[in-house]
Amino acid sequence: MADYTAVVNVTGEGRNGGRVQSDDGHLATTLALPKELGGAGDATNPEQLFAAGWGSCFLGAVRLAASQRKVRLTSTAVDTEITLVHGDEGFGLAAVLNVELGGVDQDTATALTEAAHQICPYSKATRGNIPVTINTTAV
């Protein structure tokens, strides 16, 4: 399998009024501070983009883990929460992944999410760097 590099250009004011554009044109949007941080909240923000990337990658890792174990899932969903926190050392991130897996019992669902957390590149990149909580529910 080949490597892949995403290239995104960010211009303007960054997270507060900036614009992002991928080199292939598939991603093109403006950024705004959320209302909770005193911004207009009228555009996406880096935390939402990170949550979308991690959540989609994590579900792919869950599907891979299920396939490797010959487990059939009837549904997969994740609500990914990325929190921008401000502490003594400045700004940081915290994450919560709320995973729902259908067609399996709770023990299997938990085992699959634990395996996915070892497979997913976003999980690997954040491991030991930010607090991460994974809540798994069999549905």
Predicted ranges, named:
Residues 1-55, 59-139:
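Extended beta-strand/beta-hairpin segments
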